[in-house]
Each structure stands twice: as C-alpha cells, then as structure tokens.
A protein has these predicted regions:
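Substrate-binding beta-hairpin/strand module that engages nucleic acids
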Residues: 14-16, 20, 133-162
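A non-catalytic, helix-rich entry segment at domain boundaries
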Residues: 1-77
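Solvent-exposed amphipathic alpha-helical surface segments
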Residues: 28, 128-131, 135
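Generic beta-strand/beta-sheet core signal
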Residues: 71, 100-103, 147-149
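A residue-level signal for conserved active-site and pocket-lining positions in enzyme catalytic cores
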Residues: 1, 70, 89, 124, ...
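Non-catalytic protein-protein interaction segments used by genome-maintenance enzymes to assemble
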Residues: 76-131
Length: 163
C-alpha cells in the first residue's frame, strides 16, 4: 500500500477507505504484485480496519517524511548464531525506531501473539539498532508492535519482553 496516499483521505470515512483499498488492490494486481488468487482471497474489510487504525496513520506520516521502510531483509550474528529475516515495516519517529510486524495467525487473545513473537521482534529491534548506529550510539527500536489482522488491533510487545 502507498501509505503517503493515506494522508490525502479521511481514514474515518469508510467509503473513502473502501475505495482506497479497492484501487490499491487493483493496482497491485495490474502490476503483478499479487496474483488473481491472492486478490480473490483477500478480505478487504480487514485491510480497511487496519487503514483506519492509529498505527496506519503514524505510518502514513512517516512515509510522508520519507522515514517509512518496508520489507527490509537483514542478517546478523546473535550470540554466535546467524540470524536472518525480513522486517515487515519500521519507521523513524522522534529519533526512535518503531517496529511493526503484521500477523494473520488465528488467535483469540493478544497474549498468544506476544508469547509467540516477542523474541522475534526483539531480534529485529537489535538488528535495526545495529544498522542505525552512528558514532557508536544506537538508535533504539523501543516501540515494538504487532498488528493482528485477526484481532484487528495493534499490540505492544516491547514492555512484555524479558531477556
């Protein structure tokens, strides 16, 4: 999705959001970014709910500033183990990194996702801290979030992680 474009619509206007999602999906299909099957299986209402969220608004503002980064691969050594992954999305906000991971898991409670993914997000945060270090000082990814499409909510994991 083109998050910059979200700044141009009223994300509380359900008709405008629905039209934005439809247009975005049509463009992705036309460009070959998604297949016909993916297009048919996508549940636009879940995407619309996300677009109307506060976290999507924050992402739109970051994208407008040029501070939004999507699908960034990384490789790092973590305690003698080579770790690689792809970070869904992160952005810079108030000289800090905000890290967000999208999840579609079938869960009934946020705690399930926190238990399942907080370590993964901590590793991603550590990788970003190394990437964005300047003069020996790391910019920290203090805010680590999961957006659950199933629960339709943003979940904070950063306070839950215990090393």
């Amino acid at each position: 999705l083109d998050f910059k474009s979200l700044c141009d619509i009223d994300t509380k206007d359900h008709v405008a959001v629905s039209a934005f999602v439809k247009k975005s999906m049509d463009e992705m299909l036309k460009k070959g970014l998604i297949t016909d099957d993916m297009y048919r299986l996508t549940r636009p209402k879940l995407i619309e709910q996300f677009i109307s969220s506060d976290v999507a608004a924050r992402m739109a503002q970051a994208d407008k500033r040029g501070d939004l980064y999507k699908e960034k691969p990384f490789v790092m050594d973590y305690e003698g183990v080579l770790v690689q992954g792809i970070i869904d999305v992160f952005w810079l906000e108030n000289d800090k990194i905000v890290l967000l991971d999208y999840k579609t898991d079938r869960v009934n409670a946020a705690k399930e996702l926190i238990d399942r993914y907080s370590t993964q997000l901590k590793l991603y945060a550590d990788a970003l801290g190394r990437i964005f270090s300047t003069d020996g000082k790391c910019i920290q990814a203090d805010e680590r979030l999961i957006y659950s499409f199933r629960l339709q909510q943003t979940i904070v994991t950063s306070r839950e992680y215990k090393k």
